[in-house]
Structures are given as structure tokens and as C-alpha cells.
């Protein structure tokens, strides 16, 4: 009954899928091994006779039981058979004392708790992040994934969950939001490196724990003769040294106790057999060499995860291998292929996303990890234009905006570069967005969220053909070309029929300078002021009542 109750408790220290094989050696295998050994030793200590003593003939059975219980509760000491016992002093007996055998079960249970603690810490910290790593790995390890429909549904669910969690990190990073302004350490759960950092800390705790356990074992056994108990025991075994000579885990020890007889104190020294030390010797030799092997495995695992977490090139190669094995037409030898993967990791997956894919690949296999990377890659390229615009869209000033800018905003040295760089970026963004407008629901929702209420929609092609050409047109390149502005005459001629993109506020900021007002009037004479309502024809076009002289003045002003 007791054994069944103890074994039923092992489900609370069961293994988890959100760790690698070395972690399970610590938190599952070693922990359960120590609990089992503690139960075995406890049965011998508390269920049998751990010590049996040789008492004088004058002792009755009750005195014999008393002597054995006293020697078990107090400490015995060891004296080799070739040394006299009568001449030993109290201090010398205290140095030879053996006091660890009573505490072996409790020491083993304490070690089991130490091996389990880093796993509980990892589970707690990982649960406070937006990425539920334990649930993700469980879903990827679902046995029903052999069914295609269930596998596709699980991959879709994982993709949606990762997208939501990673989008939250990108939003905080973009807006530079710090939930805790003073205690910056509490902002780590909101970063895109939190799960990876916590796993590396857990690995370090595993490594530190196994090193401390080796030191505690030497301290607990009081092996002053050996600096490292296991190596000393191995040397004694190879040299044929027995416990009688070494004194390690002695089977026979001595015990002193006093008996009050008729008011007089009688001192007795009896010889006892420590049967429990036969088990203790084998247990601690096994544990010492197991800890040594575990130390080697843990160091290698910690170094591996540290390397793949900090060295970006390994993450790029990891994603490239999965893309090459997927159904996507991806060739790593093409120009720009590695740059695409870099952008995929930097702008989309981040460190935690790559970590989750690695962990799922370890638990579920390469095929499932490849399918997940394929789905994430397709979603990234499907949302990359919207993602780029939402991440790089600047703030639009609440004032009247035109393209080209008013003459007061034009650099007199270089007419094609604005004095106000923020306005130039805003106008460039407006023009780039207008080229990607379609009638889909997703685009319309994006326009509603990103465009201000006073921005005008792009006109249709028929409306563009009815427009009068614009004489001056500047061509812009995107942000990936270092924000440079170019003026190409050939491109201007091709785009001459395309009107500028502009928008206006209902309450434009008045111009204080008299020259600015005059230039504004000249500009307005040539270009009709756009309407303020959305959805109407709001493009500034040339009017029929303008004179040639007014056109020439306005054009010379722009140049």
C-alpha cells in the first residue's frame, strides 16, 4: 500500500514536452531515480533493523533492543580492527564519528527537489509570456497529426497563435511602450527574447545544480580522505582496498552508552553491524558517476542552446534548411535569398519564434517543423507590404499637405529635396500606399486604420485619363534605398498623366509669412483645391481659366 501510494505520486514529477532530452534527464529521470532510492533506503531503515549490535550476555532482550535503538539514534564511530579501542580519547572518537546513515533518505529527497526546481521555474516563467510553449509543443506532438485534416488544423492554430504573440511584441517595440518605467526588469516578459532568455537561465540552473550536488555529496559523506568521493572509491576498487582499510561506509562500528544500575553509571562499548551501509555505498557510487555524466551532457546542451540563440547565422541556416525541404520554390543559391530569410527572422519570427520552431522540431520531428515554417513563410509574404507600412508609417502632421510641396518648403539649393524631411517621408508613404490600393476587404480595413479621415482615395484609371498632365513630376524610391530622392525625366514623362497624391485638413494651418501666402495663392490658381469629402474626385487639376502667364509663374516658382 505504501509503495503504491509513493509510486502514484510520481505523476507530479512527470516529464514535459517543452524541454529537450537533457532537461528531462534532470527533471524526470534523475528526480524519479532519487525518489525511488530514498524509498528503498527508508524501507530498510524504518521497516527493518538497520543496525544490529553484539551485546554482553548479561543484557536481557529489552536491554538489547534499547542498545540497538540508542546506537541508531546516536552516532557510532569506526576504529580499524588492528587499532586498540581502550586508549582512544573523546576528541579522537568524535573525529571518527559516522553520522550520515540516518539522514540518507532525507538527503536523497532533497536532491530530488533540487533537480526538479529548475523545471518548475521554467514552467512558471514561460507561462507568463505571450507564447504558451508547453501548449504549443503538446499540440505539435498530438498523435492525431497522422491525419491530414487534423495536422492542417493544428498547423493553422499554431500559426495564428504565434502571429498574435509576435505581433504583440512588434507593437510594443514599434511604439516603444514600457509597462514598467522604473523597474525595467519587469519589462522582460514583453520582449521578443524573453522565452529564449528564460530557457537559457533554466539551462544554467541545471548546470549549476549538478555541480553543487557533487560538492554536497562529498560534504555529506565527510570524505576528507578523498577530494572527490567517486574518484577515490574507483581508485580503491582498482587497487583492491576494502572498507576495513579505507573506512568508507564501514559495515562494523562501535557505540558507547551508559546504563544506570542501582544508582551507579556503567559504561558499555558494544560492536554494531551497519547493514544499511551496504546499500549506501552502492547508491552513492552510482549517483556520483551519474552526476558526472550528467554534468558533461548538461554542459554540452547549455553551450549548444547558447550558441544557436546568440549566433544569428545558425538561425538563418536553420530556417533555410526547412524552406528547402518545403513545397515552396526556394533556392538558397539565388541572389537575395539569404536577405529574405534575414528579413523573415528580424521582422516576423524574432528570437522566440525561432526558438519555438526548434523546440517543436525536436519533439515532433522535421516534417512538422517544415510544414509550420512553410505556413509562416507564406503568411509573412502575404502580409509583408501591410507589415512594412504599419511598422514604418510616420506621423502625419495635422496641417495641409501637398505633393509637390509649397515653394516655401522646397530647398533652394536642391529643389527636389524638401526642407521638412518628415513631410517628405509622409508624402512618399502616401504615394507608395496609393499604388497598392485594391478593392479587397483587407485593404479597405487597412486604409481605414492607417489613413486619416481627410485623405482621399486613389481615382480610377478613367478619371486619370481625363486629367490634364502635370508638367513637373518627381520620382521617389522606397525606404530600402536609403531614402534618396531621384528626378528622372524619362519616368516623369511616363507618369505625366498621373496626378499627385494629396490630402488636406478642414482647418489648415495659416501661413504667417506674406511670401508664403502669395506663393500659396499662385499655387492654388494653377491647381484647384481638393474637396474635403472622402470618395469624391479630390485631385488638384489644371483649370481652364488659367492664363499662360500664370502657369509660367507657378512653374518657375516650383523650379
Curated annotation (Swiss-Prot):
Residues 488-514, 527-559 are annotated as: Disordered. It holds the Pfam family Innexin. It is found in: Cell membrane; Cell junction, Gap junction. Disulfide bonds: none annotated. GO terms for biological process: monoatomic ion transmembrane transport. PROSITE patterns: PANNEXIN. The chain crosses the membrane at residues 28-48, 102-122, 182-202, 283-303. Residues 503-514 have a biased composition (Low complexity). Structural component of the gap junctions. This is Innexin-10. It comes from Caenorhabditis elegans.
Amino acid at each position: 500500500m505504501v509503495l503504491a501510494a509513493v509510486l502514484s505520486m510520481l505523476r507530479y514529477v512527470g516529464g514535459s514536452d517543452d524541454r529537450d532530452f537533457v532537461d528531462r534527464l534532470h527533471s524526470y529521470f534523475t528526480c524519479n531515480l532519487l525518489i525511488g532510492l530514498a524509498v528503498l533506503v527508508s524501507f530498510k531503515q524504518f521497516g527493518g533493523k538497520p543496525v544490529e549490535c553484539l551485546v554482553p550476555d548479561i543484557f536481557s532482550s529489552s536491554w538489547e533492543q534499547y542498545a540497538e535503538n540508542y546506537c541508531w539514534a546516536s552516532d557510532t564511530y569506526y576504529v580499524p580492527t588492528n587499532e586498540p579501542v581502550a586508549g582512544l580519547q573523546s576528541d579522537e572518537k568524535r573525529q571518527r564519528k559516522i553520522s550520515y546513515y540516518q539522514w540518507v533518505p532525507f538527503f536523497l529527497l532533497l536532491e530530488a527537489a533540487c533537480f526538479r526546481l529548475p523545471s518548475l521555474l521554467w514552467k512558471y516563467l514561460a507561462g507568463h509570456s505571450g507564447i504558451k510553449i508547453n501548449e504549443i509543443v503538446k499540440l505539435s506532438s498530438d498523435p492525431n497529426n497522422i491525419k491530414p485534416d487534423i495536422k492542417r488544423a493544428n498547423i493553422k492554430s499554431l500559426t495564428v497563435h504565434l502571429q498574435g504573440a509576435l505581433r504583440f511584441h512588434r507593437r510594443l517595440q514599434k511604439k516603444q511602450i514600457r509597462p514598467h518605467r522604473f523597474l525595467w526588469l519587469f519589462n522582460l516578459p514583453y520582449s521578443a527574447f524573453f522565452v529564449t532568455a528564460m530557457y537559457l537561465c533554466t539551462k544554467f540552473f541545471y548546470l549549476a545544480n549538478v555541480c553543487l550536488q557533487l560538492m554536497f555529496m562529498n560534504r555529506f559523506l565527510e570524505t576528507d580522505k578523498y577530494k572527490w568521493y567517486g574518484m577515490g572509491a574507483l581508485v580503491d576498487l582498482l587497487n583492491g582496498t576494502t572498507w576495513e582499510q579505507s573506512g568508507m561506509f564501514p559495515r562494523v562500528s562501535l557505540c558507547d552508552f551508559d546504563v544506570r544500575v542501582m544508582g551507579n553509571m556503567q559504561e558499555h562499548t558494544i560492536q554494531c553491524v551497519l547493514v544499511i551501509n551496504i546499500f549506501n555505498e552502492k547508491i552513492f557510487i552510482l549517483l556520483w558517476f551519474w552526476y558526472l555524466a550528467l554534468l558533461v551532457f548538461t554542459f554540452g546542451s547549455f553551450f549548444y542552446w547558447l550558441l544557436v540563440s546568440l549566433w544569428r547565422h545558425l538561425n538563418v541556416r536553420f530556417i533555410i534548411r526547412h524552406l528547402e525541404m518545403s513545397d515552396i520554390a526556394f533556392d538558397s543559391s539565388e541572389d537575395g535569398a539569404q536577405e529574405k530569410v534575414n528579413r523573415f527572422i528580424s521582422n516576423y519570427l524574432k528570437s522566440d519564434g525561432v526558438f519555438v520552431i526548434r523546440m517543436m522540431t525536436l519533439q515532433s520531428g522535421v516534417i512538422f517543423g517544415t510544414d509550420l515554417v512553410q505556413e509562416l513563410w507564406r503568411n509573412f509574404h502575404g502580409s509583408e507590404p501591410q507589415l512594412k507600412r504599419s511598422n514604418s508609417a510616420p506621423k502625419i502632421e495635422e496641417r495641409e499637405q501637398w505633393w509637390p510641396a509649397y515653394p516655401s518648403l522646397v530647398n533652394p539649393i536642391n529643389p527636389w529635396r524638401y526642407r521638412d524631411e518628415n513631410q517628405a517621408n509622409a508624402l512618399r508613404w502616401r504615394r507608395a500606399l496609393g499604388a497598392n490600393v485594391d478593392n479587397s476587404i483587407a485593404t479597405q480595413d487597412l486604409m481605414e486604420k492607417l489613413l486619416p479621415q481627410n485623405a482621399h482615395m486613389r481615382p480610377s484609371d478613367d478619371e486619370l485619363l481625363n486629367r490634364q498632365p502635370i508638367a513637373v513630376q518627381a520620382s521617389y524610391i522606397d525606404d530600402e534605398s536609403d531614402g534618396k530622392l531621384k528626378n528622372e525625366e524619362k519616368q516623369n514623362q511616363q507618369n505625366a498623366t498621373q496626378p499627385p497624391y494629396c490630402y488636406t485638413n478642414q482647418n489648415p494651418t495659416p501661413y504667417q509669412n506674406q511670401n508664403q501666402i502669395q506663393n500659396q495663392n499662385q499655387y492654388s490658381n494653377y491647381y484647384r483645391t481638393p474637396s474635403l469629402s472622402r470618395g469624391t474626385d479630390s485631385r488638384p487639376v489644371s483649370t481652364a481659366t488659367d492664363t499662360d502667364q500664370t502657369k509660367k509663374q507657378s512653374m518657375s516658382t516650383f523650379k
